[in-house]
Each structure stands twice: as C-alpha cells, then as structure tokens.
C-alpha cells in the first residue's frame, strides 16, 4: 500500500508539477442565485414557515454569491483567508487517505504527507489543496445550531426574529459552497486548463473555467431550465459522508467538461448537450442544498450530548493531556519548540 501511494505521488509530481491556487469564482453570480433560489423554493411544508416566505427566499437567493463578494482586492486578507474554501483538488487530497472530518486533522495529514514526500510538499500545502468540504460542514453545523436555538425559543414563546435572521444568513452562506461543489472544475487540479499528459487534446488555456461557469451560464441558462431537473427530496444520513459522495460524483464529470469544451459546447449559444449538462449540474447543487437544509432542521431536534468535565480522563487530579479541559493549557517545552524550529 505504501509503495502504491508512493507511485501515485510520483506520477502526480510528473503530471502536475507546481499546482497553483484556483482564483476563479464558482458558477458566477447568476448560477449561485439560481441554486439558492431553487433550494429555498422547494423546501417541504414541514420546514419552518418563515423560511418559505417570499422575502426569505429572496434573501437566500441574494446570499448565494456572498462568499465571492468577499474575494475583493479591497479586502486582501479576507480574500486570501477564504479563497481555499471554494475548492478541493481531490487528486491531491486523496493522497492522505480517507479525509478526516476535522479541518485541523486534515491540515496535519497534508503536512505529514509533505514531509514524507518532499517533492510534493508545495502542492500539498492546505491552501493549495483546498477546504471545500470542511467549510461546507462547518457552515451546515452553524445552520443546525441556529435551528436548534429557534426550536428552543419557539418552545418558550420567546422572540425568534433574531435567530430567524441568523438561519437565513447561514442558509444563504451554505448555498454558495454546496453550489461550488456541483461544479466539476472546483474538485480537481484540472481546474482551469488541462495539465499533465493530454492525449485527447483538451484545452490548456486558462479561460475554460470562467467560460463554462460564468459566461455560458449568463448567456444560456435560466431558472426554468434548471428547476425541472431537480431530484426528489432525499434523506441525508451522515451529512459528511453524503456530501463527500456528492463531491466525488461531481469530480467524475471533470473530463466531460473538457470534452464539451473541445466540441465548442460553451462557445456562444453552445450546444444542446452542453446546456443540458450545465443545467443538470446547477440542479444537482440546488437539490443537495435543499436536502441539507432539511437535514439540518431534522437533526436540530436531536438532544445535545452534555459535556461533563469531571468525566475527562484524569491523572493525579488533573485533566489528561489531549482532553478538551487540558488542550488550552498545554505548552510545549523549550526543547520541543527548538526541535520544531520555532525558536
């Protein structure tokens, strides 16, 4: 197994060399607004009524492109911080094995892989590989938390307007990343022009990303093209596993994008096949987003496990290192800091 992984990494070094951070925006404003609107409009009747009002639907739609509004040169630190949230290069991420659910474990695994395979260290920097499923999970959990608060306030006959505003913001914010996850070029090192061996002669220019997700959508795709292609409501089991499966299906369509582009499918009015494919991708994003909204609402009713600090493992009366009670107080020794090259 270790030998196989070494071969895979060697091939990636040959094929991809230095991998840059994608700078293209997902779907463009129009595509993101379509995804968010359709998800909000298709909520079932047992979802909270305030989420199904025309004003709420309009707000969720408006917020679809919100994270792209944070990618302005006027706010360079914000832009740099959240740019990797829009994509994940699965060919690189999968080199660490099964993706852990925790963002920081993922970062540590990428760092360890870079130490083991120095030639890949630059390409395996976390901001180059991307955090797409991590930001999605984290915003989904924010939404679920706010929905739990809404349930509690409603049960106590208290004012729910503030938490309703929070829920709509999280719902709109979540929609952006779920939408990005339906765009194949947001899941691959082949994000903006084919790199490495290219026996099929796919484009290597750096315009395919915007040509597909923005220019073509703006000119040729409308809500009415997408809505009929949405799938029926699906019950989400484990949201992390289901979302990764969704990303992997999206990734399986990367070459299809390049094939359509080679056939001039995204030029001007494009081809019927390209229009159908693009509408299907947007519909997949809207369907998954709706399903995640419903899952957050259903799971917000589940009891929250209580944390009992006294239940943490103890040693000589103190919390064991590694427990939540101890983590914030752990300080590396000077010797360890020196070994890490941090002095």
Q: Residue spans of the language-model regions?
A:
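Bacterial N-terminal signal peptides
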Residues: 9-20
């Amino acid at each position: 197994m270790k030998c196989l992984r070494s071969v895979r990494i060697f091939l990636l070094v040959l094929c991809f060399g230095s991998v840059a951070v994608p700078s293209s925006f997902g779907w463009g404003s129009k595509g993101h607004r379509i995804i968010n609107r359709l998800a909000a409009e298709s909520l079932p009747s047992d979802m909270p009524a305030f989420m199904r009002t025309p004003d709420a639907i309009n707000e969720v739609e408006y917020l679809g492109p919100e994270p792209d509004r944070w990618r302005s040169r006027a706010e360079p630190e914000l832009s740099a911080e959240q740019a990797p949230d829009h994509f994940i290069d699965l060919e690189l991420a999968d080199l660490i094995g099964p993706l852990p659910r925790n963002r920081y474990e993922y970062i540590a695994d990428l760092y360890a892989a870079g130490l083991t395979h120095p030639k890949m260290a630059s390409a395996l920097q976390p901001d180059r590989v991307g955090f797409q499923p991590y930001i999605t999970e984290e915003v989904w959990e924010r939404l679920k938390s706010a929905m739990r608060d809404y349930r509690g306030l409603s049960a106590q006959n208290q004012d729910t307007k503030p938490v309703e505003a929070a829920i709509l913001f999280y719902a709109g914010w979540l929609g952006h990343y779920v939408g990005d996850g339906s765009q194949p070029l947001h899941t691959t090192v082949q994000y903006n022009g084919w790199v490495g061996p290219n026996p099929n002669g796919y484009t290597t220019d750096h315009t395919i990303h915007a040509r597909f997700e923005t220019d073509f959508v703006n000119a040729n795709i409308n809500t009415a093209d997408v809505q009929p292609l949405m799938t029926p409501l699906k019950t989400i089991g484990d949201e992390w596993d289901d979302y990764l499966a969704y990303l992997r299906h999206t990734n399986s369509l990367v070459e299809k994008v390049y094939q359509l582009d080679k056939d001039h499918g995204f030029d001007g009015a494009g081809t019927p096949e390209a229009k159908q494919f693009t509408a299907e991708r947007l519909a997949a994003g809207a369907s998954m987003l709706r399903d995640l909204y419903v899952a957050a609402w259903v799971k917000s009713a589940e009891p929250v496990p209580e944390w009992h600090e006294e239940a943490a493992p103890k040693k000589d009366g103190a919390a064991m290192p590694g427990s939540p009670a101890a983590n914030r107080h752990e300080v590396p020794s000077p010797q360890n800091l020196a070994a890490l090259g941090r002095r």
